[in-house]
A protein has these predicted regions:
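Positively charged n-region of N-terminal signal peptides that target proteins for export
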Residues: 1-4
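Bacterial N-terminal signal peptides
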Residues: 7-16
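Sec/Tat signal peptide C-region and signal peptidase I cleavage site
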Residues: 17-21
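Cell-envelope and extracellular/periplasmic
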Residues: 22-467
Length: 467
């Protein structure tokens, strides 16, 4: 009799536990999600039953994956994704069933940074974006989707966010990050592949806020670092909730908050990228970033503190130390009125040119604008050579401006600039400098770039000196 009662009680408890078992997943694994194509995509969640077996079934191939939860109910596995397409469903069960619907397969890009990455198509107070209205009312593809991670500042890493996936349409597009959307739009137009944007950015944020505590340990004794009270707060509160979500690559638009720290930034930036790649465990995935646009940060120029040209230089030099990277140059779209360039379409397109050429193998064009390579001194002239000129250099009939030249006294004077015969090099001189030793181009807070390659991509600001 006791055995019978015990058996009934045990069965009742088992049924109760099964009924109460609830499987949950981070918000990024939700309806409308977009998974990276042709890979082993990470997927994870929780169940409230320790050691419980969890089964994942994917509708595109009817395959079942089984994984056991650990002692805290956490589980994680990988699922094979096909060539792009959809919509599909993913079914997850541990006794209770959870369905993720309207799943697309395509290309996933992480988009991070500060306000110029965050700025959405409807703009912000005082800043209206060029072409935003046209972009919003023009029929958008539902194959372009974004997952916006809400603002969250934390002292320790979080597991989840309250973000949701959204398809691009006239109702949702105003809240899409503008530069990232124009990137996705161009990729979709050229390749015909669905594109998902995992967006995590906060206006005014420093690079320190996006770095893990561990990655910053080598720099903690730096006097500038000690002044930063925002270290890791956005890495913990936002980025950590999507780390491990399988991506194709990353887009980064940040730096304005660090213009006074170019030397430190040049160390932190490659360190951050290396750390993110380590945490994602996807090797050296593509990392493309925007060089900050010119703006009148200080109205003083060189010699009155570290103007933004030094930060642009730090970003340019990072190309040499960050593997599989590229830089979208923006020297022609800055503003003396606002730190937020109104032309986000070219920002997105220039990100796309990098991805199309360097990641997706599209041939026939140079992916970015001219970058200073070397110089030679011939009498009272300096001849400047560049990478990424494509066929030739040009100035859109404005004339070459904002070149400077200096002699051994290290005093820079406005320089006359001209092309060599083939229009592949720039020759600078000044009647004020008989024996030149150094040259600069657009090395100020605010300029309107005048030097381009023949594809219309602008040259980065630069200096040949290290004074």
């Amino acid at each position: 009799m006791n055995k019978k009662i015990f058996s009934v009680l045990a069965a009742t408890l088992l049924l109760a536990n099964t009924a109460n078992a609830k499987i949950t997943m981070p918000a990024i694994f939700g309806d409308g999600m977009l998974l990276q194509q042709q890979t082993e995509a990470n997927i994870w969640g929780k169940t409230d039953t320790m050691g419980k077996k969890v089964t994942i079934t994917t509708s595109w191939n009817k395959k079942k994956y089984t994984v056991s939860a650990d002692n805290e109910g956490n589980w994680k596995t990988q699922i094979s994704t096909p060539h792009y397409g959809g919509p599909y469903e993913i079914t997850i069960s541990d006794g209770e069933t959870l369905k993720i619907k309207n799943v697309e397969i395509g290309e996933v890009w992480l988009c991070a940074g500060q306000s110029n990455m965050e700025m959405c198509l409807w703009g912000r107070r005082g800043d209206v974006l060029e072409g935003a209205m046209d972009a919003i009312v023009t029929k958008a593809s539902p194959e372009i989707r974004t997952f916006n991670v809400p603002h969250n500042m934390k002292s320790a890493p979080v597991y989840d966010s309250k973000g949701v996936w959204q398809e691009a349409n006239t109702e949702t597009l105003p809240t899409f990050p503008a530069g990232a959307y124009f990137f996705a739009k161009k990729i979709h137009e050229v390749l015909g592949i669905p594109v998902g944007l995992v967006h995590t950015s906060v206006g005014g944020s420093s690079i320190q806020a996006w770095m893990s505590k561990e990655s910053m340990l080598p720099f903690m004794e730096d006097s500038i670092m000690k002044k930063h009270g925002d270290k890791s707060i956005l890495f913990n509160g936002m980025l950590s909730s999507v780390i491990g979500y399988t991506i194709k690559g990353a887009l980064w638009y940040q730096g304005e908050a660090n213009i006074e720290e170019p030397d430190l930034y040049q160390k932190l930036f490659p360190t951050m990228v290396a750390d993110w790649r380590k945490l994602w465990n996807q090797g050296d995935f593509p990392f493309y970033y925007a060089q900050i646009a010119p703006f009148n940060y200080h109205k003083g120029g060189v010699g009155k503190g570290k103007n933004s040209a030094y930060l642009r230089e730090a970003q340019m030099k990072s190309l040499d130390v960050i593997p599989n990277s590229g830089m979208a140059i923006l020297t022609d779209i800055g503003s003396d009125r606002t730190i937020h360039p109104q032309n986000k379409e070219d920002v997105g397109k220039r990100f796309a040119y990098l991805a199309l050429g360097k990641t997706y193998g599209v041939k026939g064009f140079t992916t970015t604008g001219p970058i200073y390579k070397s110089m030679s001194i011939n009498g009272n002239e300096i001849e400047l050579s560049f990478d990424n000129i494509d066929q030739c250099l040009l100035d859109w009939h404005t004339g070459l401006k904002d070149f400077e030249i200096a002699g051994e006294d290290k005093i820079f004077h406005p320089a006359k600039a001209k092309y060599n015969k083939e229009k592949t090099k720039i020759i600078v001189s000044s009647p004020e400098v008989e024996k030149p030793v150094a040259a600069r181009y657009a090395f100020k807070d605010y300029v309107q770039g005048t030097l381009f390659n023949n594809l219309g991509l602008p040259a980065s600001s630069f200096r040949t000196d290290n004074w």
